[in-house]
Amino acid sequence: MKTLYSLRRFYPVETLFNGTLALAGRDQETTGFAWWAGNARLINLSGKLLGAHVAHAGLIVFWAGAMNLFEVAHFVPEKPMYEQGLILLPHLATLGWGVGPGGEVIDTFPYFVSGVLHLISSAVLGFGGIYHALLGPETLEESFPFFGYVWKDRNKMTTILGIHLILLGIGAFLLVFKALYFGGVYDTWAPGGGDVRKITNLTLSPSVIFGYLLKSPFGGEGWIVSVDDLEDIIGGHVWLGSICILGGIWHILTKPFAWARRALVWSGEAYLSYSLGALAVFGFIACCFVWFNNTAYPSEFYGPTGPEASQAQAFTFLVRDQRLGANVGSAQGPTGLGKYLMRSPTGEVIFGGETMRFWDLRAPWLEPLRGPNGLDLSRLKKDIQPWQERRSAEYMTHAPLGSLNSVGGVATEINAVNYVSPRSWLATSHFVLGFFLFVGHLWHAGRARAAAAGFEKGIDRDFEPVLSMTPLN
């Protein structure tokens, strides 16, 4: 048996790869978890768990800083950001750093500063993580009772929840302060094709802000993803930041009510499952936001949305054929519907052809040409500006349809370029990661509930059918 390539062939299912391996003095016998179960070995060691989390934060911030500097080093100011595979610089540009009218990058120094600040921060976090993982106290309860905790201590858990909520609220207000006082943010709707501006007239009306939550998620409604002006976005952050901070204070000052103590499972794994569930929801919402919303994610930096690229194509050929003498108001297409313009089911004038399904797109280059009943024929004949033509021609050939082999744009479009839109990447990655987090939520929720009910040991291997079957060899 010792001559076999792998001894694992003869081991029952739940045995370790190597039961004798002890990392940092923590083996399976003392912790109940094997080395590969990672932080599960630290469930009751608050000091070591702190080290793991701080080190993890250091890795995250290190990636942000290093990737930021990598993008700065490769950045070509003459090309749009979305043609260069950038995912971090568009976020910095959206916050108003380094850009001017039309989303043109006029200064890359703020991007360099951002990368360096993140790298320096990651070094501090990395040092703290290593210190607490290797040198600091194993548990914090004795030396630093404020930072210590027991998972079953419901009052302490809600206090920690409160502190987290306050930090999230402060984060929301950082965006508010940037938009109000520190140079403003990039507004894709600014006249003439977008610019950085300070937001002065916040939307604080609760009926407007919470009205988004009551909208249908379908069609022209679009739930919160339909937000299309910065006053609402920044005003929403004022509301959200205030709710988080007030909720945080509430959770610090109060103890959980009896119904909450009964309804929830109070264990480390349960809290992990709640957190994973919340992150999954964030991931799914972020996916929809980056895919459809061109206000929070301006097309100048992230490339056009799918509907936007499609409408841009219809607009581009309307402009071309109108110059060649076509009467765009009455020309019929092959199906008998309008070739360039038609009416939506509710009567608005919209672009004809295949792009009719995207008729509720709103984009800054197109809205000036609308009247009270949809697209205005007289404006289409007299008011089209060169910047609108240039932008739509550019967006037409940059549809966010790129596959992994980088054949970007519409596959049959002869003017398409080799590129994958950051919108495709950000939407897909957040959906996939959100899905994985959701599966993790179900897994850990099931384990936590089973443990609370007292049967977490899993299947009894003594009566497994395979044990009574003839060995394969």
Curated annotation (Swiss-Prot):
Residue numbers bearing the Phosphothreonine modification: 15
Cofactor mode of binding and number, as noted: Binds multiple chlorophylls and provides some of the ligands for the Ca-4Mn-5O cluster of the oxygen-evolving complex. It may also provide a ligand for a Cl- that is required for oxygen evolution. PSII binds additional chlorophylls, carotenoids and specific lipids.
Gene Ontology biological process terms, A to Z: photosynthetic electron transport in photosystem II
Subunit and interaction comment: PSII is composed of 1 copy each of membrane proteins PsbA, PsbB, PsbC, PsbD, PsbE, PsbF, PsbH, PsbI, PsbJ, PsbK, PsbL, PsbM, PsbT, PsbX, PsbY, PsbZ, Psb30/Ycf12, at least 3 peripheral proteins of the oxygen-evolving complex and a large number of cofactors. It forms dimeric complexes.
Keyword Mitochondrion listed: no
A Pfam family matched in the record: PSII
GO CC annotation, single: photosystem II
Keywords: Acetylation, Chlorophyll, Chloroplast, Chromophore, Manganese, Membrane, Metal-binding, Phosphoprotein, Photosynthesis, Photosystem II, Plastid, Thylakoid, Transmembrane, Transmembrane helix
Residues given in the record as [CaMn4O5] cluster binding sites: 367
Described function: One of the components of the core complex of photosystem II (PSII). It binds chlorophyll and helps catalyze the primary light-induced photochemical processes of PSII. PSII is a light-driven water:plastoquinone oxidoreductase, using light energy to abstract electrons from H(2)O, generating O(2) and a proton gradient subsequently used for ATP formation.
Regions that span the bilayer: 69-93, 134-155, 178-200, 255-275, 291-312, 447-471
Cellular compartment(s): Plastid, Chloroplast thylakoid membrane
The keyword Thylakoid belongs to this UniProt entry's keyword annotation: yes
Record membrane topology: Multi-pass membrane protein
Propeptide: 1-14
Protein name: Photosystem II CP43 reaction center protein
Xref: SUPFAM superfamilies: Photosystem II antenna protein-like
Family: Belongs to the PsbB/PsbC family. PsbC subfamily.
PTM sites of type N-acetylthreonine: 15
Cited Gene3D superfamilies: photosystem ii from thermosynechococcus elongatus (1.10.10.670)
HAMAP family: PSII_PsbC_CP43
